[in-house]
Amino acid sequence: MTPEIIAAIKQRIKDFTYIQDVRVFNDQFTKMLADGNPFGYNIASPAALIEFSPSSIEQLGNGVQIYNPIQVTIHIGQMELDGNDALMDEAISIFELRNQVYLAMQEFSTEQMARMYRVSENPDYNHGNWYVYQIVFETSITDHLMQRPKGYTEASPTLTTTGSYQ
């Protein structure tokens, strides 16, 4: 994954939602709630974590490769103790965040990334007072890191032999 793609997705979420804590996913919600928070995670609420699933990589030619398809999961988390509706265990504001992220990311693209399309979504349970929701998008991403310059050709080694063969 390229740093430019990660930065573009992070910025898109920040620009089109009220989520400002946007990071690369490292199972922070689970680790933060581990006994005594041994990993030291401190996440602002609401938060969005970006996860790139493993993908097959194809060679396009001239050094360019493509991740096709690749799934990008946005883990949306919000700490909520009470939804102000007298129902302690029913905080529905996570769905407002889900809608914001969906509207921001559906059909989002960059020069290296094809349009993103939502393919699934689901709640993620067992995170204490954190409500977590996942939206999975699918896209294709080209990697130009090893792209050869236009007109590039491999140099053939020049071999010079001396002596004779009998």
PLM regions and their residue ranges:
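A short, hydrophobic secondary-structure junction motif
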Residues: 51-54, 76-80, 97-108, 166
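One-face residue pattern on beta-strands with alternating periodicity enriched for small/polar residues
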Residues: 12, 71-73, 134
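Small/polar-rich, solvent-exposed N-terminal microdomains that initiate assembly or binding
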Residues: 1-64, 151-166
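Acidic-leaning, charged glycine-interspersed low-complexity segments
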Residues: 20, 42-48, 91-148
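Short histidine-centered catalytic/ligand-binding loop motif
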Residues: 81-94
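Short, charged, solvent-exposed linker or helix-capping segments at domain edges/interfaces
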Residues: 85-86, 146-155
